[in-house]
């Protein structure tokens, strides 16, 4: 099997791609809000509760999702979370009440809270300590890219069909991203296309190796 050069950068690009979808999905409501409020009769006060439901669930979900990722494993846990927020995004289209939307936003926020912990976990797993700042910056590009791509895509979906269609499309992207992540992501120990040279480069820069080297140097002195 042919080895892939700079395999670690493929992995961080993958998590960046998932982060793009993550932020695209969460931004969709803000773009569609005027149309939703006009067609459903949802008031500004009710809309504020919808927004708050997401923020509360997202805030509470971050440490929980971090624990979930550490416990279950990065590959499976992040795929599950992406699938859940994809289904929750699509669920927006099935409800026209503020309480229904608030529930979907809360479910979406809780599962979307996995994105940053997953990105940090990928960077710490795949990169030596000296490159993690750059790796984290690369995957975090997805936050801005997702927020940037959402307005034209969501607006087009609304004009082409309806606000419900916009959430079906954006949610479908998350489901595809979940599958893509599950089948493409590999931990270094399972990555058959990772060269021995790059594997050594990554592992030699990990904390456990750096500590060992430091102890050896200290004992020699």
Language-model segments: which ranges?
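Helix-breaking motifs and short loop linkers at transmembrane-helix boundaries and internal kinks
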Residues: 41, 73, 94-100, 111, ...
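Cytoplasmic helix-loop-helix junction between adjacent transmembrane helices
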Residues: 104-143
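Extracytoplasmic
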Residues: 10-44
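Juxtamembrane intracellular "pre-TM" segments in multi-pass secondary transporters
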Residues: 1-4, 187-221
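Conserved MFS/SLC helix-loop-helix module at the cytosolic interface between two early adjacent transmembrane helices
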Residues: 60-99
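Helix-loop-helix hairpin linking two adjacent transmembrane segments in secondary transporters
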Residues: 143-188
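Residue-level signature of mid-helix packing/kink "hotspots" within the transmembrane helices
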Residues: 27, 55-63, 147-148
